[in-house]
């Protein structure tokens, strides 16, 4: 499985909520993305599409999610997972060897 890990900073809109994002790459990226998303759901609880987090208000329950995902509509081969600090470590230990 080919993964590219990025640390989020001020260039990224959600850097105040999430610390890392992972781009799922490679020939089997769609299948791997679904597998990773299912694993995250089981390990960290429900997630949500990034767009919902992006447009959430401060009092919105959406901001409490520990992880989210994003499929880039401009390029559907860009499949991302976003993590808060506490979930990123567990993901990296399991998937980023």
Regions found by a protein language model. Give the residues of each.
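The feature represents the first ordered module of a protein
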Residues: 1-73
């Amino acid at each position: 499985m080919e993964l590219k890990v990025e640390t989020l900073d001020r260039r990224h809109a959600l850097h105040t909520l999430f610390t890392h994002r992972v781009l799922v790459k490679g020939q089997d990226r769609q299948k791997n993305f679904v597998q990773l998303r299912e694993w995250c759901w089981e390990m960290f609880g429900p997630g949500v599409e990034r767009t919902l987090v992006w447009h959430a208000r401060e009092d919105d329950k959406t901001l409490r999610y520990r992880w989210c995902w994003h499929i880039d509509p401009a390029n559907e081969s860009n499949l991302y997972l976003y993590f808060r600090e506490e979930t990123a470590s567990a993901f990296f230990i399991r998937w980023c060897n």
